[in-house]
Amino acid sequence: MAKHELPNLPYAYDALEPHFDKETMNIHHTKHHNTYITNLNAALEGHAELADKSVEELVANLNEVPEAIRTAVRNNGGGHANHTFFWTILSPNGGGQPVGELATAIEAKFGSFDAFKEEFAKAGATRFGSGWAWLVVNNGELEVTSTPNQDSPLTEGKTPVIGLDVWEHAYYLNYQNRRPDYIGAFWNVVDWNAAEKRYQEAK
């Protein structure tokens, strides 16, 4: 049976410093993300009919997952899908402004890049407990949203363009309880070229 595996990061653990510190990145990737994968593989044991499905397919079609393992797949499959996506939209050469059609769409939808950042930051800062803030494409339109725990926008039929993990494990070593500071630091490492590519694929 095919196993889900931890993807390699496209940069070193210290590449996003000082914004995202080396120790947090290492623990986040090798411990937290890896645990979701271990638990997902355990949940899928004995379910050969799900073996060939990508994690994105699993979380996008939870109603097709047997009820006995649906919650485990939602939580751990969501954790795997969300983190796999997250690593790809971060870059040591990130920051700056959105590019291409995404830049135009953000301007049209939110009025300005600053207004978008404010709405995204609010989604992340006001998410009670653990969860994620997202910029998604929903029915062809950009939308800022948040999800609880490891729920994926894919489950709601939405396609992520950028996302930010606001679980404490993502920032506590460096930012303690200062979640807004962590959200502010995120803008220095967003890979807008990757986000533009995601937008092109989603719209």
UniProtKB/Swiss-Prot annotation:
Q: What PROSITE patterns is this protein classified in?
A: SOD_MN
**Per UniProt, which keywords does this protein have?**
Manganese, Metal-binding, Oxidoreductase
Q: Which cofactor is essential here?
A: Mn(2+)
Q: Gene3D superfamilies recorded for this chain?
A: Fe,Mn superoxide dismutase (SOD) domain, Iron/manganese superoxide dismutase, C-terminal domain
Q: Which residues bind Mn(2+)?
A: H28, H83, D165, H169
Q: Which GO terms describe its molecular function?
A: metal ion binding; superoxide dismutase activity
- What protein name does the entry list? Superoxide dismutase [Mn] 1
| Species this chain originates from | Bacillus anthracis
What high-level taxonomic lineage is stated for the organism?
Answer: Bacteria, Bacillati, Bacillota, Bacilli, Bacillales
- Gene (name only): sodA1
